[in-house]
Amino acid sequence: MEEKPRLIDSFLFRAALIFVLLLPVLLRRDLTPTNEMKYLEIADEALRDGHFWCLFHNGEMYADKPPLYIWIVMLFRRLLGCHCAFLLELFSLVPAIVTLWVLERWCSEELSSRWRAAASLSLMTCAWFLGSAIVLRMDMLMTMFITLSLWTFWKMYTGRATPADRWLFPLYVFLAIFSKGPVGIMIPLLCIPVFLLFERRFRFMGTVWGWRSWLLLAALCGIWWFFVWREGGSEYLNNLLFHQTAGRAVNAFHHKEPVYYYCYTVWYAMAPWSLIAIPVAFLPLFKRVEASPMVRFLLAVAASFFVIMSLVSGKIAVYLLPIFGPLCFASCILLQRMEDGGSRTAVILRRIMLWGSLLILAAAFVIGLFFPGWLNSLL
């Protein structure tokens, strides 16, 4: 017997609900001095000194991040004459909602509306995902572009891509790089071939990473690096390309952690839904449930990126943000297959994920409305 559709099953309703419940948090919290205020200061310094491609903080080079997010801060500073934290926070919240929409649209052929609701709300309320959706950082922007690139790859892989998708794929990859740096290319370049190897279709790499992808990526990066060199000279370009990439990967000068760091941080970074998503992700290994090609791809991306980032010297929990979506949605597809097979446990878990997520969002509303000081201490 089919269940009647509910209001919560509508993506537009869920998106509006997320926005309304997080609105007090967005309006009443204070900006953090270590990261958020620093980005505003970098934007002010760039506007004052006429820098556009090269970033500086208190006169010192700040090649840690590409300029895209700072450009957004600069744009609103120029338009409004002051910084508006609420508008800037939307450039984290809106990409988070777009990421949910992409994953729901992508997985709609394997997930019912009820399971899509559970998957997207549980992803939204993962600790680090929710936190990244309300702070002034570029991580969610990068996650959105990575998710778009993965969806575009899947359309190419399954023969559903339009001619434009062959150009959109490298464009999304570039925008991910331009948002956060080299971590933006790691999933499309390193994790996709892992999946293709397991599927014995490695030759498809020539279609995904063919001449169009490399041409557009080289052209856009070349333009960026040329203007960086023109404005900041060889020293800034060297800092951007080598010190901030190879230095962080091999012998990090910031956030250096042991190789097993993510083995324990992933549990609280995805909390509370790591307790469901991660164990369920291992079920196909034990033949408890069959994994479709889509699930295999999502899990291959999550597993390979986890291993790759564990081998990188510099580690922060938020670096795992791009794999939260694949993990949550893959686990929900597996749970729905179990429910279709008569599993009562899967039904219970779906309800826990749905109502637990709504409870977390309601708690965020109350805290933002009545206890903003406590929220500031958390961030």
Task: Describe each PLM feature range.
Residues 1-344, 371:
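Membrane-integral, polyisoprenol-dependent glycosyltransferases
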Residues 347-379:
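Transmembrane helical bundles and short interhelical boundary loops of multi-pass, membrane-embedded
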